[in-house]
Amino acid sequence: MINGIINLKKEAGMTSHDAVFKLRKLLQEKKIGHGGTLDPDVVGVLPIAVGKATRVIEYMTEAGKVYEGQVTLGYSTTTEDASGEVVARSSLPAVLTEELVDQTMTTFLGKITQTPPMYSAVKVNGRKLYEYARAGESVERPRREVTISLFERTSPLNFTEDGLCRFSFKVACGKGTYVRTLAVDLGRALGVESHMSFLQRSASAGLTLETAYTLGEIADMVSKQEMSFLLPIEYGVADLPKMVIDDTELTEISFGRRLSLPSQEPLLAAFHGEKVIAILEKRDQEYKPKKVLI
């Protein structure tokens, strides 16, 4: 069995599920999952867990993500990105300056509330929102709180001859954030229709785009029996508090027994030497093995 984390550079035109399906065939390994869905048109970092690493991928999805993208002011779409049909057009504000855009972007920092787009996989009454959208049905969407730690403009405002304005941005955000909704809400705050016209995920769970591999690159390495693209399973628990255990505690964990450890953290990544061997969960005053990885 292959175990580890892959820093995959997902290319445009494929779903996150497509990427997993292709890797299963390529690596001849059924136990593969991804950490954090990317829309088909979005490129960038997609953490992939293989083998035992699938048991810790949930702890990677809790980590923050960094995106780089582009906002287009002047019209909105059904999907809130460039792939959708035009819903409405509007003229640009009489006064639209870089200073105004920058000031408005700062109002989205911290904890904010978003309404997920209709074309998303969020479930309402057991059905995904995009299923309602494709059927032409309306449904009340649950608002959710997300965290934005960085939201800044990274290019000058580009005014086009057809009355649009585009600019690039960078955003660092927490789990569950819809960046296309952020682009739409920014436009609304500026008093203009808008959508997200480009997006790439440049970092996720400590993995960066600079060190990511495409499916083609991975296929080429596998054909040469080169597996250096596979990161240790320990990358999957990098954001959890670490606790080094001794041989006696290792034996106790292997039998599923509770341990008394000097910590108050709700979850611990238990290490024996340099290897993660379990995820421990605090129960009363002791730690119970939640996931044993040996």
Curated annotation (Swiss-Prot):
GO molecular function (one): tRNA pseudouridine(55) synthase activity
Enzyme class: isomerase
Active site: residue positions: D39 (nucleophile)
Keywords: Isomerase, tRNA processing
Gene Ontology process terms (BP): mRNA pseudouridine synthesis; tRNA pseudouridine synthesis
Enzyme Commission number(s): 5.4.99.25
InterPro entries on file: PsdUridine_synth_cat_dom_sf, PsdUridine_synth_N, tRNA_psdUridine_synth_TruB, TruB_C
CDD domains per the UniProt record, alphabetical: PseudoU_synth_EcTruB (cd02573)
Catalysed reaction equations from the record: uridine(55) in tRNA = pseudouridine(55) in tRNA
Family assignment from sequence similarity: Belongs to the pseudouridine synthase TruB family. Type 1 subfamily.
NCBIfam families assigned: TruB
Protein name: tRNA pseudouridine synthase B
Native source organism of the sequence: Streptococcus pyogenes serotype M3 (strain ATCC BAA-595 / MGAS315)
Lineage: Bacteria, Bacillati, Bacillota, Bacilli, Lactobacillales
Gene of this entry: truB
